[in-house]
Amino acid sequence: MRPSNREHDQLRPVTITRNFTNYAEGSVLVEFGQTKVICNASIVEGVPRFLKGKNQGWITAEYGMLPRATHSRTEREASKGKQGGRTLEIQRLIGRSLRACIDLKVLGENTITLDCDVIQADGGTRTAAITGSCVAMRDAIHWMVQREKIKKMPVFNYVAAVSVGIYRGQPVLDLDYAEDVLAETDMNVVMNEQGHFIEVQGTAEDNSFNREQLNSMLSLAEIGIPQLIEIQKNA
């Protein structure tokens, strides 16, 4: 039995609230159960040095947690003077995932930055950030079209992410914190609306996992992610 009384293949309640803040070109509050993340998309003219003159855009991300997003206060990374390895890893994951949504050439030499701020953490913050940022980014691109910064809305491939893992010997979908801390295996899966995998990150925590368990976890992701993409489209 899962702590939340969910079935092994059941997502937490997921909501996506668009236009959550006033100033960003795209803004979303995404909620996976008690995990809540604000995802703001900002358009900035120009691209990183390695892309200058190539007439294509760039998509990048920043990620952070508020001090009381967790059960006890966590010191802000800014006060420490540097970002931690976990934060850098998550930022890169979000950026890679979102760059799979569109052909970067349609952006011209513009950069979209996704700021993902966790206001409450109960497991799956990075997967929630990816899922919410996809919607925020689409709204930001629509903003670019409205202001004639690009000619037309490009083909947009929705991307979503979910956690899967082995909890008490059973593969489960969308782990909350109570499950995550006891999971024998923890995996994050990113897929697009065609059902193709973009990224799979899996780690054995206490016990190694076999091919059958791996397949079971991927199958659970294939159940959950289409549901998330449907929620994205209906937001």
Curated annotation (Swiss-Prot):
Phosphorolytic 3'-5' exoribonuclease that plays an important role in tRNA 3'-end maturation. Removes nucleotide residues following the 3'-CCA terminus of tRNAs; can also add nucleotides to the ends of RNA molecules by using nucleoside diphosphates as substrates, but this may not be physiologically important. Probably plays a role in initiation of 16S rRNA degradation (leading to ribosome degradation) during starvation. Belongs to the RNase PH family. Its EC number is 2.7.7.56. Phosphate binds at R86, G124, T125, R126. It comes from Legionella pneumophila (strain Corby). NCBIfam families: RNasePH (TIGR01966). Homohexameric ring arranged as a trimer of dimers. This is Ribonuclease PH.
